[in-house]
């Protein structure tokens, strides 16, 4: 893992040295003037500049979790998150949304785990566009269920596939995409995301047009990214790529920020290009209790505990107070979990990919 020195600020752009050891050249701090040119500054880590090959790296997109949510998730926004199905759910970002008391949000996701339930329970959500909301380990999500029963939440039912189509249409810049997927189901009843059409090539062929979705912001969790937002991710993508490309703004939360050379060394794993990204947040264990392949496994006990401790509104409020409001940030959250619990979630059986040669 990279070792980070203290950040330095020069003008309006921050820089810091990232030392990845002998295989990667260290990155040195610099200043940037109004014309975007770089000038090497004094090293803030002794010996880090003793190399013929220096790299400049802009920190303009790097944010704390607090600042990223404050800047890019306004009240009333439509927010796509949890797009990778049951893994890499951006819980840390969701908890920061709760801490900042965001209101009137529209939550967008496929089969959506307990993060949606927490956001609903905290009063952040006004609408939900999803295929399912619940606790993947236990079934029902009590805050969501109660809100629906009391007509306190507007819900638009989707399937995983029709949600993918809606986001893909948004990414393509077209108003809809056709499908046969929802034919003969109740998914479309009272749902303005579906409109019956007929094929222009086979006039008697009935189809459903799925309305495009363009989230105001998409939040994703990945294994690693550079400071410009170019992100490596492996494992189940779910509908993450569609959600990123359809969004007006994108926040990438990464387990670690690495040098650009690390990202460019494996271009096929760079599934999110930096030009789509507005903010990059480094947040270790930011997806807990969901798993991140290669970093940590699912905390099954946490899902069981959440199920047992949130059956009633007053119990849910206590849980949110204990795990969100009274926890200053993700580091405090991890400390509350405890070292033993974190260590127990470490990768037990590594499954390394074969090395690829990109040479000619």
Where are these regions (language model features)?
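Conserved alpha/beta enzyme-core scaffold
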Residues: 58-360
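Basic polycationic patches enriched in arginine
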Residues: 7-9, 16, 54-55
């Amino acid at each position: 893992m990279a070792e980070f020195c203290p950040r330095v600020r020069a003008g309006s752009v921050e820089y810091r040295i990232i030392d990845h050891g002998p295989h990667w050249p260290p990155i040195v701090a610099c200043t940037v003037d109004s014309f975007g040119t770089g000038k090497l500054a004094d090293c803030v880590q002794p010996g880090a500049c003793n190399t013929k090959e220096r790299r400049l790296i802009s920190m303009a997109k790097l944010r704390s979790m607090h600042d990223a949510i404050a800047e890019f998730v306004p009240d009333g926004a439509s927010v796509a998150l949890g797009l990778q199905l049951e893994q890499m759910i951006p819980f840390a970002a969701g908890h920061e949304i709760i801490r900042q008391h965001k209101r009137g949000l529209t939550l967008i996701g496929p089969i959506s785990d307990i993060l949606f339930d927490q956001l609903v329970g905290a009063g952040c959500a006004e609408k939900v566009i999803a295929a399912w909301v619940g606790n993947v380990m236990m079934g029902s999500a009590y805050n969501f269920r109660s809100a629906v029963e009391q007509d306190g939440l507007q819900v638009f039912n989707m399937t995983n596939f029709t949600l993918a189509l809606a986001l893909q249409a948004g990414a393509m810049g077209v108003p809809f995409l056709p499908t046969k997927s929802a034919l003969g189901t109740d998914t479309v009843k009272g749902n303005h995301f579906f409109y019956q059409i007929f094929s222009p090539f086979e006039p008697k062929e009935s189809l459903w047009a799925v309305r495009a979705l363009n989230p105001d912001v998409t939040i994703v969790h990945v294994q690693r990214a550079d400071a410009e937002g170019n992100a490596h991710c492996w494992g189940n993508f779910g509908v993450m790529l569609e959600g990123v490309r359809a969004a007006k703004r994108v926040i990438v939360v990464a387990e670690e920020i690495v040098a650009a050379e690390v990202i460019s060394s494996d271009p096929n794993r760079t599934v999110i290009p930096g030009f789509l990204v507005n903010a990059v947040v480094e947040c270790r264990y930011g997806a807990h209790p969901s798993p991140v392949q290669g970093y940590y496994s699912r905390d099954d006990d946490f899902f069981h505990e959440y199920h047992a401790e949130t059956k009633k509104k007053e119990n849910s409020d206590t849980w949110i107070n204990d795990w969100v409001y009274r926890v200053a940030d993700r580091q405090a959250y991890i400390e509350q979990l405890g070292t033993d619990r974190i260590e127990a979630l470490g990768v037990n059986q590594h499954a390394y990919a074969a090395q690829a040669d990109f040479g000619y």
